[in-house]
A protein has these predicted regions:
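Intrinsically disordered, low-complexity regulatory regions
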Residues: 1-115
Length: 115
């Protein structure tokens, strides 16, 4: 893969990640709290929001792992009947960011408790 091809792929993913993060935001939060979904599910399960985000991330990692190991995937955004492998990568990267946000918030809360 050339540098130009790599940069094009990176740009394609960054554009999709941003668009999908904003689109899915409306499905999982009713206001400004970007972590509302993780907090609510964490409350239901007796977990921390970061643990919920990690579980969601792992679902996508497992799906990507299976696709790579079996070679059974469509390298596109969509495939007949669902998401293509590119979409799963974008979702995983977005969940990494949301997990980082959970940990950032957690670190701030812990810092407040110790000061």
């Amino acid at each position: 893969m050339t540098s130009i091809e790599f940069e094009n792929l990176r740009d394609e993913f960054l554009t999709k990640e941003s668009a999908i993060l904003e689109w899915k935001r409306g499905e999982y939060t009713s206001g400004e709290d970007r972590l509302q979904n993780f907090r609510e599910v964490a409350g239901f399960l007796g977990q921390r929001p970061a643990e919920v985000a990690l579980s969601y991330l792992m679902k996508h990692i497992q799906s990507i792992t299976r696709a790579v190991r079996t070679g059974n995937y469509v390298w596109d955004w969509n495939q007949k009947g669902g998401e293509g492998l590119k979409q799963r990568f974008v979702d995983a990267r977005n969940y990494l960011l949301l997990l980082a946000a959970c940990l950032e918030e957690e670190a701030g809360i812990n810092k407040e408790r110790t000061t």
